[in-house]
């Protein structure tokens, strides 16, 4: 993936303001609520029976933070995203058997969460850069499936 200087600035500038715990928890919770079939990968998380149960679930919050923390590695390694996610791709493919489409869904939800948190600061140019990033991460995570 080729990044312009402007795209890199838009991504890193916004990332510096992201509350990883809050946005990560919200993104994963939204994934589980909006796309309930994704819950089958999280059966060990306990009660996911309703939106309020998912939103209040400490395991969802903790894993959401973990997911977005690892996403931060993409921000730090924009020029080497494939290698950054090689091990996670292997884990999600070989051991967890996660449908790679779920990576794309989570990326799209992250865009919604960022737009909600940053409002007018999440300009169309910023959104375009972040959309490119979430696609690159989803592609890197799906790499072991090909």
From Swiss-Prot:
Tissue specificity remark: Red blood cells.
Residue sites binding heme b per the record: 63, 92
Protein's UniProt keywords contain Heme: yes
Coiled coil region boundaries: none
Residue intervals of the Globin domain: 2-146
Function in brief: Involved in oxygen transport from the lung to the various peripheral tissues.
Subunit note: Heterotetramer of two alpha chains and two beta chains.
Protein family per UniProt: Belongs to the globin family.
Protein name: Hemoglobin subunit beta
Organism: Psittacula krameri (Rose-ringed parakeet)
Gene: HBB
């Amino acid at each position: 993936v080729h990044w312009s200087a402007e795209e890199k600035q838009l991504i890193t500038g916004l990332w510096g303001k992201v509350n990883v715990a809050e946005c990560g928890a919200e993104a994963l919770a939204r994934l589980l609520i909006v796309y309930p079939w994704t819950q089958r990968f999280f059966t060990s998380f306990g009660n996911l029976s309703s939106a309020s149960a998912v939103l209040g679930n400490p395991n969802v919050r903790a894993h959401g933070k973990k997911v977005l923390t690892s996403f931060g590695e993409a921000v730090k390694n924009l020029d080497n995203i494939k290698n950054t996610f090689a091990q996670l791709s292997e884990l999600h493919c070989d051991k967890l058997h996660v449908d790679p489409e779920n990576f794309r869904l989570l990326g799209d939800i992250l865009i919604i969460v960022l737009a909600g948190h940053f409002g007018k600061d999440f300009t169309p140019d910023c959104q375009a850069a972040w959309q490119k990033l979430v696609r690159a991460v989803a592609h890197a995570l799906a790499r072991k499936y090909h």
